[in-house]
Amino acid sequence: MLNRLLIIFIVILNNFFLNYAYSDDQINFDVSQIEVLEGGNKIIGKKRGTITTNDGVVISADNFEYDKIKNILKAKGNITVNDEANNYIINSENILYLRDQEKIQIKGKSSSLIFSNYNFKSEDIVILRDKLILESNKPTTIIDKKNQTLYEIDKLSFSIKDEILKGEKIFINTKFNQPFSDNYFFKNAIFNLKDQSYIAKDIDINLKKDIFGNKKNDPRFKGISSSSKNGVTTIDKGIFTSCKKSDKCPPWSVQAEKITYDQNKKKVLYDSALIKVYDIPVMYFPKFFHPGPTVKRQSGLLVPHINNSNILGSS
């Protein structure tokens, strides 16, 4: 009699999980220990395991709690979220998956790998799965492994599908794993990481110190806005100087309504250029240019070498 009751109980339990796995709100549990509460409306998984949702998300964690009525999944401890369909992986300690809203809230610190190329380290991020957008209002570090570029951003929104990055208070280090690199500071910007184009406001670009053959220099650009696409970078209302930053008033500078670096034509052009010495205007040029970085000798007033950078333009 006891064996018969045990067999009936096992059959009922198996049927429950089979029906649940193939329901409209399918979640398949594969955990070491499971608890079913509130008439089957709450499921708790313990002692490590994996769940797979019907929309292709695989989550591994130490503990799970699923509220079937609210369609909310909680996970804690050594979490890995793998969305194979959309090509991203997230590691964290605490997540809340609001399935009806298609929203995954990652609480605390986390790391994310997108397209096996973009490595995000952030805190309190949100994944909007229906829009494929990653958001965070906390400082975030992004490493673009392909282009060897480091981004540090105070606030961001990243389109996983389009590889479009929007951010505020942005620091960029190009070729970050090399001894010398260029540094960029943008108040806010939008980047297309696919083709390395961007538009930005309130820019401050610090070129590597030895770019003109003198490590004591601090060559830099400032401008109210900048954009870059298809090998052409522009800076609006820009200022250029290579004087040391410790000089409160730079001994010299070039100001222009527009500065254009055209990689295709191998030229750097200035519109309405004003040369200043100790902040005193001394010479004005409606048009002013010098050869680009790939040109060693050419007629012109200046022959600089601009660092090899996908942000400003590759030399």
PLM features per residue range, with description:
Residues L2-D24:
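Classical Sec-dependent N-terminal signal peptides that target proteins to the secretory pathway
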